[in-house]
A protein has these predicted regions:
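Short alpha-helical transmembrane segments in multi-pass integral membrane proteins
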Residues: 1-21, 79-146, 188-243, 299-364, ...
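N-terminal transmembrane alpha-helices
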Residues: 8-40, 44-45, 59-74, 78, ...
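Transmembrane helical elements of multi-pass membrane transporters/channels
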Residues: 19-38, 140, 174, 203-207, ...
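Helix-terminus/linker motif at the lipid-water interface of multi-pass membrane proteins
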Residues: 29, 33-52, 121-128, 184-191, ...
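Alpha-helical transmembrane segments and their lipid-water interface positions
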Residues: 31, 35-42, 65-72, 76, ...
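Small-residue-rich hydrophobic transmembrane alpha-helices
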Residues: 51-111, 148-167, 273-337, 368-390
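Short runs within selected transmembrane alpha-helices of multi-pass transporters and secretion channels
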Residues: 72, 141-159, 167-175, 196-209, ...
Length: 446
């Protein structure tokens, strides 16, 4: 893993960035696919209440998953930094300390999700017909939260080492098992939302076992010792990077939970339509998300090696790649959102509501190509406190108030509610540009 392919400090930026990003994107696509399979199979073989339960419950699971992913970004950045600085002997402490920290987090999440599943479902304002199914989905996923957390931490370790292909294999295993599980439990045994949750947990568990076996057998550029598995100074270092990102992501996801609650008040069909739209949104956001994760690894190595100009060039390269793909995704979502929605359900009313939301959301596919590339650049530069601050501003001062205002209007429009996301992203871009200019003030133009 220390070969030329994982050395981002030399060679073509475009080729190396795309080569590293593609497996990351592939893993995200498969991850979104097995999440979409839950909704697809329940939509086809379950009930409308089950569809609403899975869509609402998956919002809670997304909150947990995305926060853990951002917190583990600290591990990715720190490993990349130590590789760039030629100090691989420090990586063992990062991984061992990370295992301890995330084990504690898993225990806390288990207790909260299992014991408070129903209050969480009520807080989410799940439709009355779907409260029990939502609580069941959350409770079962909470029971297996250790595997969900472990997968994301292991993926962060491999990406930090410059290996984006192994996480792709992990999620491929999970995707296959989840599809088989959904078909067996939901389509075959008619277990509705509960079957989808069991399949999700089983898939993640198998993926974690596969990842651990691969990590143990792999020739690593460092030594992992028993004494590494304790609280150590590396824990504070990766938390300094990851914690601000996790806080920002937590509030962002809470804003989406609040948005889900706003829309749930509009009825069962609107709730189900929003759930379908969210699955399409997850796919639409894959390229920006892959860029952000890849950019953090790419930039952290170059910053560690003192190649700051190359780090800046990689950000602009990422923006260019993101915008080219983003234009295609925008046209597909805006013009053919109804066709995409019909993949998940045959209910015409649900399809119509999903498409209404997508029409307002569509510009987000362009804005995030810029925003996420810049965020990845700042993450790699250890400017995660700023990333958190801009996230809080656009979430608490723009997205949530605007979405709430739109949701309480007479004959509330899902299209207008959907527009809250791209408007808040535009604010985030302005803040990022300001921070970038401030960081590089006084530098001579080349």
């Amino acid at each position: 893993m220390t070969n030329d392919k994982s050395d981002f400090t030399q060679g073509s930026i475009l080729k190396k960035l795309v080569a590293f990003m593609m497996p990351v994107l592939g893993a995200l696509i498969l991850q979104a696919a097995y999440g979409a399979v839950d909704l697809l199979v329940v939509g086809r073989f379950g009930s409308t209440a089950g569809l609403s339960g899975v869509s609402t419950g998956s919002q809670v699971l997304n909150l947990v998953t995305f926060v853990v992913t951002q917190l583990s970004m600290g591990i990715t950045v720190l490993i990349g930094r130590y590789l760039g600085e030629k100090r691989p002997q420090l990586i063992g402490g990062v991984i061992g300390g990370g295992a301890v920290v995330f084990a504690v987090i898993s225990v806390v999440l288990f207790a909260v999700m299992v014991t408070l599943a129903r209050p969480i479902s009520v807080l989410m304002q799940a439709p009355a017909e779907a409260v029990n199914l939502t609580a069941t989905y959350v409770r079962i996923c909470g029971s297996g939260i250790f595997f969900i957390v472990a997968y994301n931490v292991l993926a962060a370790i491999f990406r930090g080492l410059g290996d984006s292909k192994s996480p792709l294999m992990f999620v491929l295993v999970a995707c296959i098992i989840n599809i088989v599980g959904d078909l067996a439990l939901v389509a075959g045994l008619h277990m509705d939302a509960a079957g989808a949750a069991i399949a999700t947990v089983a898939a993640q568990a198998c993926s974690v076992v596969f990842a651990v076996v691969l990590l143990v057998k792999r020739e690593l550029p460092f030594t992992l010792k028993k004494e590494n598995f304790r609280w150590n100074k590396q824990c504070l270092k990766f938390l300094q990077v990851g914690l601000p990102l996790a806080v920002q992501e937590c509030l962002t996801q809470i804003s989406f939970l609040a948005l889900c609650a706003f829309i749930n008040r509009l009825g069962l069909e609107a709730s189900s339509g929003y759930g379908v739209a969210c699955k399409i949104v997850n796919f639409a956001m894959l390229v920006p998300s892959a860029l952000m994760q890849s950019m953090a690894s790419f930039v952290s190595q170059n910053v560690g090696a003192g190649k700051h100009k190359r780090a800046k060039q990689s950000m602009f390269t990422g923006i260019g790649v993101g915008l080219v793909i983003g234009c295609c995704v925008f046209l597909l979502v805006f013009l053919k959102g109804d066709l995409l929605s019909s993949i998940f359900t045959t209910d015409a009313a649900v399809v119509a509501h999903a498409y209404d939301y997508l029409k307002g959301f569509a510009p987000e596919t362009l804005g995030t190509a810029i925003l996420f590339s810049m965020m990845g650049y700042f993450n790699g530069n250890n400017k995660t406190v700023f990333v958190m601050a801009q996230g809080l501003i656009q979430t608490l001062l723009v997205r949530l108030p605007l979405a709430y205002y739109m949701s309480i209007q007479p004959n509330a429009s899902l299209t207008k509610i959907g527009m809250a996301a791209p408007i808040s992203t535009a604010v985030g871009i302005v803040l990022c540009i300001g921070c970038y200019l401030y960081m590089h003030r006084g530098e001579k133009k080349v």
